[in-house]
Amino acid sequence: MRIPKVMSTQHPDNVASPFFSTNVVLSGDDEVLEAFYAYSHLGCDEQMWDCEGKEVDAYVVKKLFTKHEEFFRENVLGRDLRLTLRVPNPEEEKAEAKILLEQLETIPRVFDLSKLFYGEDIAPIFEVILPMAKEADSIDRIYKYYMNYVVGKQNKATKEGDITIAEWIGEFKPATINVIPLFEDLEYMLKAPQILKEYLLDKEVTEQRVFL
């Protein structure tokens, strides 16, 4: 897997509004367009999609594919380019905790959309960023929740003797996701090696990114 070199972190404080924006405050379709320009004009190979502390467009992948089809046919989202969710930390942001669950549920949906678009199994979103990370358990809960509940429910039926959810709705992919801890406080930056060692103890991963 190719590691991205340049990430756009969504609308930093600018001297003036960008040329594509219809409002001073970027939101909705302006954020989708910003992501496209980050990829196509600025040469970024990764866009952070910030779900922390604000409303976010859950249909960003569909809008990118629909409005910029030719670009994303040539630049495969999930292979050449990445779209990475920054999710709320439930331990630190109680009022937004359930937004985390909402965003995890979108990952199999956009996988299905991508399969229709590219004709092969490519996950356009397969990583999430956990801000204010402090311990291995916080990272692991997201990893296990996605694997055991978001994807795991496909093997269950809504009632005894009925078909499984996968037979009813279709398979849920990808089977697992990567969770990127963002260590923001010096104390936890210094503990990052130990925290990651504990988190990875029961996992076989080919890559693990860490943000400081």
Specify the residue positions occupied by each region the protein language model found.
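Short mixed-charge
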Residues: 149-174
